[in-house]
Regions:
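Bacterial N-terminal signal peptides
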Residues: 6-17
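Short sequence/structural segments immediately N-terminal
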Residues: 20-307
């Protein structure tokens, strides 16, 4: 009987001990989350049980059957939870996330990627956030019922913590309905799987825009080259002082490519000839007053994009 007890105890200790990358042994606590909750009873910790990470019915989650619970993310906590003698300091938890993090960004993200890297469309390594050493916990909040960065109404504020210029642009008179809570940043950007320069949700800017603005996609009988090339040639997607989120006022925007030379920009006289010198900005009017189909036209006589 004593031999059997010894064998069982040895097996238990073996399951509670793993080897770290450095060859050292790290001890897991014997009672999982119960050990942690004996001290960590604050609301910010208990909120974990309202979210997806603590769902006991999800076999993929940290609290699924046979999983390591808190230690699946925070690493082995046996030493941290052990009784501390008077005068000694309690060892730090293996991986602490977010503010006051003691682990490197690589260690923090490694804990998350251990599960989430298998998600469809997920490609963290090499994208802009990874290259700038952004930790998952800088954007995500796990100990909560609803992660703010996953909610349309709250996601922009999380992004704006770093992207201050975009916050300012969104305050301009003409912008996507971000502030109204009708769309979020991830409608256009993919922070995890994008490989494009600006981390677009699709491979290019135009493909991303056309997801919503399908009527501008074409193909058209009469194309407007800047539209086919890059929507950003004419539009400021984060906000503008001009209708249609144009990057400049109509005449100046158009004349950044089109010269006014040879264009009747003043009222003609009785002979159909200009009466005075042409105004460089067409009397302050807007090219779009006449060239209404600026994205392209399928009209047989629409080569000038006027119908």
């Amino acid at each position: 009987m004593r031999l059997l007890t010894t064998i069982i105890a040895t097996a238990m200790l073996t399951t509670l001990t793993v080897s770290t990358a450095g060859g050292q042994e790290a001890n897991y606590s014997r009672e999982g989350a119960d050990t942690c909750l004996s001290c960590h009873e604050e609301d910010s910790t208990l909120a974990l049980f309202k979210g997806a990470h603590a769902n006991p019915t999800d076999p993929r989650g940290p609290f699924g059957h046979g999983q390591l619970q808190c230690e699946a993310c925070h690493g082995p906590g046996g030493d941290h939870a052990a009784r501390v003698r008077r005068g000694q300091e309690r060892p730090e938890i293996t991986i602490r996330f977010g503010a006051g993090a003691t682990a490197s960004v690589e260690q923090q993200n490694g804990a998350c990627l251990g599960c989430h890297e298998a998600d469809a469309g997920f490609g963290w390594h090499g994208n802009d956030h990874d290259m700038n050493e952004i930790a998952c916990a800088d954007c995500h909040t796990s100990h909560t019922a609803s992660d703010p960065v996953l909610m349309t109404s709250t996601q922009p504020e999380v992004c704006f913590d770093c992207h201050q210029q975009q916050r300012t642009q969104m305050l301009k008179p003409y912008a996507h309905p971000i502030r109204q809570g009708k769309m979020d940043c991830s409608g256009c950007h993919s922070t995890h799987g994008a490989t494009s320069e600006w981390q677009f949700a699709q491979q290019t800017l135009n493909q991303t825009c056309f997801d919503c603005h399908a009527e501008k996609r074409g193909p058209y009988l009469w194309e407007h080259a800047p539209v086919a090339e890059d929507c950003g040639n004419c539009h400021d997607p984060h906000g503008s002082n001009y209708p249609g989120m144009l990057s400049m006022r109509g005449p100046m925007l158009c004349q950044s490519c089109h010269s006014q030379e040879g264009h009747p920009s003043v009222p003609a006289d009785a002979d159909g000839l200009p009466g005075v010198a042409a105004s460089p900005y067409m009397l302050g009017q807007n090219c779009l007053n006449c060239h209404t189909q600026s994205h392209g036209s399928n009209h047989p006589s629409g080569s000038r994009l006027m119908r």
